[in-house]
């Protein structure tokens, strides 16, 4: 019988204990994994800075020889298992070697500077005149104008409503003598 159950019986409690006893109730010392706040973060910061430097130089992978945060590699902590064939030191096809350099980045001065005035002067031979531009602007403000049918139109509600899920078949009722003159 554990401590909680014995205490419940001694006090005459009608409610039995639920679940396993807490570690603090057993008097056991907390596990080392429980104390996250006491860890030294300076080694983590150095590893992070090294990794950022490698990435800035163009290296896409971090070598496996530097353990991250004490035991094991960073990839093992994240839940990725390293294959034994991949950890033989050879570069995979997607990894870059240390000597490979990235192409040089463009400097801000190399970027194209737009000069709108010169572009407007160059477009003087534009086939679209101000009337075309004004008409397109009016269609943007009223989008139904371009979709509206031209000419005499009869209202058709099927354009504005989805078709029914159950087809409706009207039963035609003929009056006697309605089509007598059609036979002649």
From Swiss-Prot:
One of its GO terms (cellular component) is nucleus. Coiled coil: none annotated. GO terms for biological process: chromatin remodeling; muscle organ development. Residues 42-56 have a biased composition (Basic and acidic residues). Residues 1-14 have a biased composition (Low complexity). Disulfide bonds: none annotated. The keyword Plastid does not apply. It holds the Pfam family COPR5. Its main location: nucleus. It comes from the Eukaryota. The modification Phosphoserine is found at residues 66, 75. GO terms for molecular function: histone binding. Keywords: Acetylation, Chromatin regulator, Myogenesis, Nucleus, Phosphoprotein, Transcription, Transcription regulation. Residues 1-136 are annotated as: Disordered. The modification N-acetylmethionine is found at residue 1. Residues 78-89 have a biased composition (Acidic residues). It is found in: Nucleus. Histone-binding protein required for histone H4 methyltransferase activity of PRMT5. Specifically required for histone H4 'Arg-3' methylation mediated by PRMT5, but not histone H3 'Arg-8' methylation, suggesting that it modulates the substrate specificity of PRMT5. Specifically interacts with the N-terminus of histone H4 but not with histone H3, suggesting that it acts by promoting the association between histone H4 and PRMT5. Involved in CCNE1 promoter repression. PANTHER family: COORDINATOR OF PRMT5 AND DIFFERENTIATION STIMULATOR. Interacts with PRMT5. Interacts with histone H4; specifically interacts with the N-terminus of histone H4 but not with histone H3. Interacts with CBFB. Found in a complex with PRMT5, RUNX1 and CBFB. This is Coordinator of PRMT5 and differentiation stimulator. It comes from Homo sapiens.
């Amino acid at each position: 019988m554990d401590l909680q159950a014995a205490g419940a019986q001694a006090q005459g409690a009608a409610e039995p204990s639920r679940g396993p006893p807490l570690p603090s109730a057993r008097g056991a010392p907390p596990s080392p994994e429980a104390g996250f706040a006491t860890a030294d973060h300076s080694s983590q910061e150095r590893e992070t800075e090294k990794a950022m430097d490698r990435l800035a130089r163009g290296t896409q992978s971090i070598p496996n020889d530097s353990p991250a945060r004490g035991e094991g590699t960073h990839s093992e902590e994240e839940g990725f298992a390293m294959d034994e064939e991949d950890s033989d030191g050879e570069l995979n096809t997607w990894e870059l070697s240390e000597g490979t350099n990235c192409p040089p980045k463009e400097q801000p001065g190399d970027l194209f500077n737009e000069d709108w005035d010169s572009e407007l002067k160059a477009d003087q031979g534009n086939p679209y005149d101000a009337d075309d531009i004004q008409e397109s602007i009016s269609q943007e403000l009223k989008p139904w104008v371009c979709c509206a049918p031209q000419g005499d139109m009869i209202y058709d509600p099927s354009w504005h409503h989805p078709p029914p899920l159950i087809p409706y078949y009207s039963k035609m009722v003929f009056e006697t003598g309605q089509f007598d003159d059609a036979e002649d």
